[in-house]
Amino acid sequence: MAMAGCNGFFLHQLRQPRLQLARQLGRTPSRAYSAPSNGSIPAAKKKYVPTKGTYPLGFRTSGTIVGVKPSNTTKPDLALLTSDAPCVAAAVFTKNKFQAAPVTFSRNLLERRKNQGIQSVIINSGCANAVTGKGGLEDATKMAQEADKCTGQNESTIVMSTGVIGQRLPIDKILNKVPSAHGALGGSHDHWLAAAKAICTTDTFPKLMSRTFALPSSPGVEYRIAGMTKGAGMIHPNMATLLGVIATDAPITSAALPSALKHAVDRSFNSITIDGDTSTNDTVALFANGAAGGKEVAEGTPDYDAFRAVLTDFAAELAQLVVRDGEGATKFVTVRVTESASEEAARRIASTIARSPLVKTALYGKDANWGRILCATGYSLISEPGQPINDVPEIAPEKTNVSFIPTDGTAELKLLVNGEPEKVDEARAAEILELEDLEILVRLGQGDKQATYWTCDYSHEYITINGDYRT
């Protein structure tokens, strides 16, 4: 550990002249895991970006260059999504106490409108409009009002922002570009991709998905769902962890949509972590305009169960794209805790393992250090200093098992069996840890409940990116 610390110190020293020169020239240095400065997508990430899609009827999107950050003159940073008809809409927001102005504005609007009559969402990147006081709330309101003018519907637009905290928006620049954003709206794949690019900050690739589905009562109707999300850092659940917009042309009631979204978010965006930080701006919103027709979906029906399942699977895949783009990440890691006495205990254990810096750095170093996994498991349910370990009956060391599960379909590598260490085949462990995707499986031997989290490793690059973020 001391040697690793020294290596980190010398790497830091070597980087300083490069960082200082880059700042003098008004740019940040190139980074191995960051998006290239010309806006192109790294070769290793292109496989996650769709080249086509099937998008919901009646929705149009655009991505427009504003220059919210003074250094940005080439990349779109204002996204607009609009429905041709008013939607039922719902959103889940951050639980961070310092909630950003757009979060406050959008939450209040949805409450006033009772999740109905929402037609647009406008999103800027480059500035979070968080911790900006009354002026920030006024700016968020102005953004919504300008979008409302374009649709001709008052109080029909929610707002999202992402970027640096504690700075005011260049609101006049944004407002001047809203008509252009509206004029550029379209329903093609390129339009959706442009919007997905516009909400990115430190993301190395735009995160966009679409698919079709059917409902039991309308087997002849093809419904569509599409979503875009952004996030690469400051990702840890205590609501939704990032920005996400999902739209469907299925007809969903205003009572059913919020409950379906909450269920989906708890099992997707609330089950990922990159660095354990919960943002001030986290928002995931869901819009349903009913443009595809068919019977309206209400709670307590087979249609509702089917839609909720589709939404949950879709949201999970969308959330996993965020983990695959974790700042500086080289691995996508599934942490699965099974045989738990309760789902809550399984979630807390999986979450603790997934955000442990020691686990994440070991994975980056391709080190089969299962002791760190066991350590995180052991303290995961201790909520207060001095709490007796007898107060944590959900974990029994003599029943606990830990394994690596390869993603290539080969046999699991058992590391701990019933609390006893296995003789680890280091060569086999090295093969598994060379893979981009891997799974950590913890069996508690206490019941039949389980939980899954998705995370990534920690590399030197994570520190470089976040040490230089504001430039």
UniProtKB/Swiss-Prot annotation:
Q: Which pathway does it serve? A: Amino-acid biosynthesis; L-arginine biosynthesis; L-ornithine and N-acetyl-L-glutamate from L-glutamate and N(2)-acetyl-L-ornithine (cyclic): step 1/1; Amino-acid biosynthesis; L-arginine biosynthesis; N(2)-acetyl-L-ornithine from L-glutamate: step 1/4
Where does the transit peptide lie? Answer: 1-33
Q: So what does this thing catalyse?
A: N(2)-acetyl-L-ornithine + L-glutamate = N-acetyl-L-glutamate + L-ornithine; L-glutamate + acetyl-CoA = N-acetyl-L-glutamate + CoA + H(+)
Instruction: Give the site residues for Involved in the stabilization of negative charge on the oxyanion by the formation of the oxyanion hole.
Output: 162-163
Q: Which GO terms describe its cellular component?
A: mitochondrial matrix
Gene Ontology MF terms in the entry: glutamate N-acetyltransferase activity; L-glutamate N-acetyltransferase activity
- Enzyme class, UniProt record, top EC level: transferase
Question: Where are the catalytic residues?
Answer: 241 (nucleophile)
- Record EC number: 2.3.1.35, 2.3.1.1
Which PANTHER family does the UniProt entry name for this protein? Answer: ARGININE BIOSYNTHESIS BIFUNCTIONAL PROTEIN ARGJ, ARGININE BIOSYNTHESIS BIFUNCTIONAL PROTEIN ARGJ, MITOCHONDRIAL
Q: Which protein is depicted?
A: Arginine biosynthesis bifunctional protein ArgJ, mitochondrial
- Say which species the protein is native to: Chaetomium globosum (strain ATCC 6205 / CBS 148.51 / DSM 1962 / NBRC 6347 / NRRL 1970)
| Source species taxonomy | Eukaryota, Fungi, Dikarya, Ascomycota, Pezizomycotina
